[in-house]
Amino acid sequence: GFDVVFVCEGGAFEELTRLFERRGAPVRDSSDDDLRFRFLVPVGRTVDDPTIDSSSFAATAWFQRRWDAIGPTLTHGLRLKPWPRTEQRIADAVAAAGLAAAGWERRRAVVLLLGPGARNGGDLTSDEAVRFLVALRVPLFVWSIGKSPSPETWDAATAIRTAADFDVAVARLRADLRRQRILWVEGAHLPQAVALTPLAKGVRLAR
């Protein structure tokens, strides 16, 4: 199966809602993939405790739907209240999404949706969040939503300016996840302690 966690920055949510309001009928997905996806909002609530300092993020339940339902679920199926853009803990939320995606023995990914005015106000930097996901072996995809790129220092390899662009990005995400394979390694090992030898031809660790 496939598990995908989307971190949706506020500006990206507004841009996608606008794009999907004026789109035509999407191409129907006839696949029978076992897909689950959820959305996480990068606004954290810090919990101070004598022994621990942690942050929680608003997240939806897992949706078990087709690939073509991702965009409509986000833009029409959720009731999200506006939140201050200056309080977005984007990198922190990406790290939390990585933990959520890695929680099950399934093919997985985190997708960060960035709008034009995205600003990170969290404790982690983008580089620190990326390194954390690499250690977890969770691939990260960054999609830039709208005509202007985000000023944040994420490697947004995918630009989305129309609803059709979103469909193409989802198709590429699905193709990448379908290439993932899960191997069981005997014993108890930290993910970052597992490495490939030169004999592993045509194989790379997910990151």
Predicted regions and their residues:
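Scaffold/interface architecture of coatomer-like assemblies
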Residues: 1-207
